[in-house]
Amino acid sequence: QEIKEARAKFNNNEIAYEQLRDVEDEQIAKLVAKEVQHGLKFVTDGEFRRRWWHLDWLKEFDGFTTKHLDKFINGRNNHIELGMIEGKISYDPNKAHKEMYAWDFLKNEASKYGVEAKKCISGPNMILIDHFLQLGIKDTPYYGTDIEAVIDDIGLAYQAAIRDFYNHGCRYIQIDDTSWTYMIDDTFVSKVEGLGYTKAQVLDWFVRVSTKALENRPEDMQIATHFCKGNFKGNPLFHGFYDTIA
C-alpha cells in the first residue's frame, strides 16, 4: 500500500523519483525479512518496483518502447501498454539501469541473512509477441520485415544483460514468459493466422530467440523459467492445454 501511495504521488509530480525509490527500498527490505522468516533460501523483491511484470524490464533495452492503448479484456475496457520495436535492440551495460539498481539492492538485503537472491526478468519472446502479434505490426523502423535479424539481436541483447547481472553477483535468474501460453489459446491462434503466420512458425521464433538468449551463459549461473496462463486483474488471459505447445 505504501508503494502504491508513493507511486501515485510520483505520477502526480508530488514527490521526486528518489523519494519513491526510498519507499520501495524500505518495503522490499521488509519483504525480504519476511521471506527469510518463512524459511525461503532464495528471495525476491516481489517485483515491487514494477508497474508491468514484463515491460519495465524490457524497457532496459535500447530500441524498445511501449504504446498506450485501451483494450477490451475479460469483459471490461482496460488501459494497457504493449511493447514495440523502435530501433536496433541492444543492451548497454554501461548505462545506469533501474533493474540493476533493483538487483544490487536485493542482493545486499539477501546477504544480511545469508540467503541467495533470485532475479526475475521477462523472456525475449515477449518482444516478438507484442510487436508482431498483439499489435499486428509487420515491420520495424530499423529491421524492416527481417524478423531473423530481430531474433538475432534480441538474443544478443539478452546475452549481454545476463552477463551484466552475472558481473553484479547474480547466480540465479528466472525467466518469466507467458508468450508460450498465448499459443495454447484457439482465439489467439486464429488472430495469428489472420496476420498471415502459422502456430508452428511462431513457436519456431520462440524456440530460436529463447535458445539464442541463453547462449554463452556462465556455467555457474542457474537459469530457470516460468510460464502460466497469464493473470490480468486476477483472471487468466488464455485458455487451452499445455500439451498443444509441448
Locations of regions flagged by a protein language model:
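Domain-level signal for soluble alpha/beta catalytic cores
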Residues: 1-246
